[in-house]
């Protein structure tokens, strides 16, 4: 398995955009649209896991997430997805580790993540900060992890 950190100039950008847009998770369409619109700027990246030459998972490293602007946390890991056929192989853990290494290399001591999932990210070492309002009028859990 290979993990690539990508900008829009990466050879696999279009392939991962297509994969995200067609995956079984509805948020994949949101990521694909952001990729098509070239919304990843500066140090923001999409990370993709490839197995046998095809994408099987992805996540993103971004400055902002869906929290209200009054919360000044950054950067974020988001859009964590692994294809159902490849789950149980620790691919999401490897994606998270790749993002942590990238964040550390870029001088960030922590990475934040929002999620409605209970108990999922704690197993990777994330610590819950609390429940925070989002731009969508919902409340999400906010987690952090040292990079």
Regions found by a protein language model. Name each.
Residues 1-34, 46, 50, 147:
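Short amphipathic alpha-helix that is part of the acyltransferase structural core
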Residues 37-43:
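Short loop/turn motifs at secondary-structure junctions and domain boundaries
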Residues 48, 54-65, 76, 81:
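Conserved beta-strand in the GNAT
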Residues 64-77, 87, 135:
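A conserved beta-turn-beta hairpin within the catalytic core of GNAT-like acetyltransferases
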Residues 79-82, 88-101, 113:
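Conserved acetyl-CoA-binding loop-helix of GNAT-fold acetyltransferases
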Residues 103-115:
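Conserved GNAT acetyl-CoA-binding A-motif
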Residues 112-117, 133-147:
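C-terminal "cap" of GNAT-fold acetyltransferases
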Residues 124-132:
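Conserved acetyl-CoA-binding loop of GNAT-fold acetyltransferases
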């Amino acid at each position: 398995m290979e993990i690539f950190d990508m900008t829009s100039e990466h050879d696999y950008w279009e392939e991962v955009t297509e994969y995200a847009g067609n995956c079984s998770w509805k948020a994949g369409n949101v990521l694909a649209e952001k990729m098509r619109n070239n919304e990843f700027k500066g140090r923001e990246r999409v990370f993709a896991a490839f197995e046998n030459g095809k994408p099987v998972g992805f996540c993103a490293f971004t400055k902002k997430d869906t929290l209200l602007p009054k919360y000044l946390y950054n950067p974020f890991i988001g859009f964590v997805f692994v294809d159902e056929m490849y789950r149980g192989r620790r691919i999401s853990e490897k994606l998270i580790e790749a993002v942590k290494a990238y964040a550390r290399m870029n001088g960030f001591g922590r990475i934040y993540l929002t999620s409605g999932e209970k108990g999922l990210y704690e197993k990777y070492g994330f610590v819950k900060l609390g429940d925070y309002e989002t731009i969508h009028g919902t409340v999400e859990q906010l987690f952090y992890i040292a990079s």
